[in-house]
Curated annotation (Swiss-Prot):
A divalent metal cation 1 binds at residues 216, 227, 424. Residues 37-47 have a biased composition (Acidic residues). InterPro entries: Creatinase/aminopeptidase-like, Met_Aminopeptidase_Type2, Pept_M24, Pept_M24_MAP, Pept_M24A_MAP2, Pept_M24A_MAP2_BS, WH-like_DNA-bd_sf, WH_DNA-bd_sf. Residues 22-36 have a biased composition (Low complexity). It catalyses: Release of N-terminal amino acids, preferentially methionine, from peptides and arylamides. Cotranslationally removes the N-terminal methionine from nascent proteins. The N-terminal methionine is often cleaved when the second residue in the primary sequence is small and uncharged (Met-Ala-, Cys, Gly, Pro, Ser, Thr, or Val). Its cofactor is Co(2+); Zn(2+); Mn(2+); Fe(2+). Transmembrane segments: none annotated. Binds 2 divalent metal cations per subunit. Has a high-affinity and a low affinity metal-binding site. The true nature of the physiological cofactor is under debate. The enzyme is active with cobalt, zinc, manganese or divalent iron ions. Most likely, methionine aminopeptidases function as mononuclear Fe(2+)-metalloproteases under physiological conditions, and the catalytically relevant metal-binding site has been assigned to the histidine-containing high-affinity site. Residues 1-97 are annotated as: Disordered. This is Methionine aminopeptidase 2.
Amino acid sequence: MAAQVPTEELKKLKVAAKSDDPAAANGANGNTANDSDGSDDDDEPEDAGAAAGGEGAKKKKKRKPRKKKKKNANGQTDPPRIPISQLFPDNSYPKGQEVEYLGENTYRTTNEEKRHLDSLNSDLLTDYRHGAEAHRQARRWAHKHVKPGMSLTDIANGIEDSVRALVGHSGLEEGDAIIAGMGFPTGLSINHCAAHYTPNAGNKMVLEHDDVLKVDIGVHVNGRIVDSAFTVAFNPRYDNLLAAVKDATNTGIREAGIDARLGEIGEAIQETMESYEVEIDGETYPVKPIRNLNGHTIDRYTIHGGKSVPIVKSADQTKMEEGEIYAIETFGSTGLGYVRDEGEVSHYAKRADAPNVALRLTSAQKILNVINKNFGTLPFCRRYLDRLGQDKYLLGLNNLVSNGIVEAYPPLVDKKGSYTAQYEHTILLRPTVKEVISRGDDY
């Protein structure tokens, strides 16, 4: 999920102290995603037996067998409905791409002290690998099924239903979505819209052949958020745009590591992306980094942590540190390379430093209670409130925004007529190695 470069006023805001128990602060009931038995009740009925023989016996009408979900080579159905915990017993989830540190940090791979520190992170790694495998399987469905003519609502529901099934939490019971589920609303931003767009109720938008679609998916398990995005384009004229951004993201991942300086990572990303150009309808465009969008750290139950990773050259000398978790994301554009807020808001999140304000509107009090119990500080959208049976909540929600309790995230757009692309991975700066937790065979 994209992080904007903060304004000077936002820079002055004090960062609230974080709770020692994020799960409790977010209303979790003490259960964890790995406590779920993940039982699956999709057993198929047996075919009806042959009718009894005998003279004059009436011929029984054959029962039409239920259509079975197709299974992939890994035992998963299509669409994916078998929880990841059933496919990987004993929490033996696949590792991400492990990359050894370079330079002065080469020693970390074999250092006994660092290996011991790494072993203390088993719960964190289990949760992240669980979420990452759910992410890979959900986006595998998207790669296969997202086609021109599909509505954005169907795409969003297809991805989100898959994620919830894969982590074994539907999110319909109070507090269930805080244990595991969507890390943030699925971003489906088209063409000059770069980020923070997901359909609200009644949305009629349909994906067209010449569209460039950014698919930004967040999966969380016990508040550990996997944030990873890719771009879909059906017309090959956009190939270089997608290649530029994918290459730039991989450059950022390569340069990232313990003691790496954020400004230098941004410079390397910019150099890579600006080495590309794309020809559209006979006109050549340089691929520009969207300079006011950043990568970012990820904290537990908080998608945007305290550090930002620029995608252009910066004087920021801040270093990455051991134990941090980063979303390395880059955005490229054929337009201005700068985005602004425009359009109907769909994304919201309760602020971690939300003030204690006396709310006068009953509707605001009611919807805040729903947010606290079902999302905590995880981002959500209007569809998620609709799904929980909430209605007539918009006035109350807007009141929470105006009181600084909830942050609204409008769509971020470049110049109309331009095209934008995005690629993103989540990386863990473990004591011994850098793990690209969301890496898959697709990107």
